[in-house]
Structure formats: C-alpha cells, structure tokens
C-alpha cells in the first residue's frame, strides 16, 4: 500500500512552494503520495508561519489534535517545518514531545535523512541550520497539476524591518543562479504550465549568478526578460517586492515585457512617514507613490494590492488618517491587513504601545471596509468588458463550469460545454464579464471551437 504524507501550510506563498517541495522530496525518496486527510497519513507535516502570534499558536493547537492520531497509529511521524521551527527549534519537542521532526525552510530537502535518523535512533530530529541555497541543489524536478506554478528565485531577507522575524527565521538574502531558475521554469512549461509566479521575500533584491560559480550577475529585471523568452510561458507574476528596491530598470520592464501582468503586490505597510521610519522600511510615502505613478504611466490599468499594519506602537489618529488617505489615493484592489503583533526578538517588540486594542480593532475594521469597497467597485467596473483569462480547471461551485483568473487575479467562472473542458484547461481565452460578486466574477466564453488552439484567439 502506498504511504501518504499530509502537509498543512500556514502563511505566505513561499510556504506554499516549500510545502509542495516537501511532498516532491518525500515522493522521490520514499514514494509517498500527498493526501488531504491527516487520518490517512503516515507522515504529518506542519509548514509554519511566525509573522503573527495567532498563526504561531495555531500550530500548537493543531499539534494537540494530531497527537490522538499518533496514539492510535504508533508508526505515524509528525514534523514541524517553516519559520516557527526556525524560531523555536528544539523547544517545540519540549512543548510537544510527540513531535518527531523539526526543520527550517532551508533544510526541508534533508527530510528523508531526518526520517531515517528518527527511525534508527528513536529520538526526535532537529535541523534548523541555514545552509544558504543548498536545498535547491537537492530538490527533485517539480511535479505540477494545472497551468500555474510558483518558482522560488531566492531565499531570506536582509532588510531587517523593526517588526519582522523573517531575517531571523529564513536568513539573509541569497539568490539562485539564473540558469537554475530558468531550467525550473522551462521544465514547468514542458508540463503545461502557462503562468509562473516568481517568489521571494524581496524579489527586487534578486542578484543571481548567470551560472553556478559565475561572477556575472543578473538582476530581477533581467530574470523576468529571460523567463518571458521561455516557450509556453504566457504570464509572469511575482511576489513579494519591496518599494525601496523598485528600480527604474524594473519599472521599464513593464514596457518591455507584455507577459508581465498588469497586477502588482507592493507592500506599503503604512501611510505615515513617521511610522514607516519606526518600522525601518527605508522609504517615504512620496517615494512609494512615485513608483506607482511611473508604473501607471506605462500601464494605466495596473491593479495594485498591498500589506498594511494597523496599530504599530505609537500610531496616532493622525497617522491612521494618513494611511486611509493613501488607500483612497492608490485605489488598492486588495490589502492583507492586520493589527500589529509584536514578535519576540525584534526591535519593535520593545517599543511602548499605549493604544487600546479596541481602538486598533476599530481602525482595522475601517481600513478593511474601505478596501472591500474598492474591490467591489473595481469588480463592477469589469462588467461588460472582455477579459483575457487563464483557464485553471472546473469551477469549485459547479463542476459543469470552468474557472480561470484575470490579470488582476479575479476568479472568473463561466459555462462551457463539458466536451470542451479538457482542451480549454490551460488555455488563454477571452471571456465577457456579465456579473460581479463579492469574491468572483461570472462571464461567458466568446468562442468555442472544435480546434483547441482556436480557444486562445
């Protein structure tokens, strides 16, 4: 009987990518297949996030629930990976003695060896070292389902924002060689991938050697241009970027590379220069707006999403008003916004914070309501327009319909003859938008033909 692995992922898209790689590593080494049911698993892995306290505590809550599974199935192995593992290390085993494996983002490729050592010794294995970019040299070729895929281009972050644990849990910035990234993307394209999302904590800082050991360096704009030249790749996305390193070279890429989507996730974190300085973000609101102004001069239809932190220590009502003014001016399409969560070991954790939580919550609700109004307005403005979408598969709500995404990341559901589904999935097609809903759009396919290629015209 085939053994199975269950992975629960917390946090960012980098973690989603890493979770897929955990499955790939265990499949290549031991033949394990992924399961969506922990009860069926022989190995249960939690890929964790420590950006906010709530996410960190949820890991231990979930660990408590799977403890019963281990008691009923003694051979079951339980592992904790990701940023909480990097931060807590062996203390995870002290707190939850039934955990067998603790590994960081940079050591997931060592899972098979750690499992062997655990079985041989009977003791929990902990490896949270930072062997730089080593893991990419030991990962098997990517296995993908569907026309979209993530590709990690670098690891870590060297910005050391005052509130953020990422540099401490993932290490400083290290870029993959250009050739390595291009080889992975080309392999994905051969499997039918049409859209890649280039991943990094700060992709703007990408500085990859042209080949392993080379002294010649490619910047992020160069990488995008090379990816665009790979046959089969029709869309390029990336996340996450940092305003401080959004160079003119990268801005110019929006004019040179049509395959680069007109959607940008550019975290601003706050709209007050005073708070941005306390956060050690390294830019002003004016500098941030200047980047967006230049981009929209090239791509007037650019949609913009961001991250925002409400209730940072010392935030006044005036600071919050400046944040809201920026939200209105930028017309954000989406925002991942949260109340500030102090993280142990970061400089901001020592700052005096005298703002009552109920005030922070009220501000967050106001911010999120405003963003939701923006989202609804933008969705309504798309009704009646023809949108180019990448068909990803059957609709979740109705398997008789298909679903795809627009450039600005809207889900579009549309009816299509069942016989046409296999040839439409993975194609770029035109859909006329008829209805806008809170979290999706509905449209109609403009052309259905017996010729699969005709679906892309």
From Swiss-Prot:
A GO-annotated cellular component: cytosol
Domain Radical SAM core: 143-377
Pfam family, one: UPF0004
Main location: cytoplasm
Catalyzed reactions per annotation: N(6)-dimethylallyladenosine(37) in tRNA + (sulfur carrier)-SH + AH2 + 2 S-adenosyl-L-methionine = 2-methylsulfanyl-N(6)-dimethylallyladenosine(37) in tRNA + (sulfur carrier)-H + 5'-deoxyadenosine + L-methionine + A + S-adenosyl-L-homocysteine + 2 H(+)
UniProt-annotated location(s): Cytoplasm
Residues engaged in binding [4Fe-4S] cluster 1: 12, 49, 83
Entry EC number(s): 2.8.4.3
Signal sequence extent: none
Domain of life: Bacteria
Subunit structure: Monomer.
NCBIfam families: miaB-methiolase, MiaB/RimO family radical SAM methylthiotransferase
Protein name (database record): tRNA-2-methylthio-N(6)-dimethylallyladenosine synthase
Gene that encodes the chain: miaB
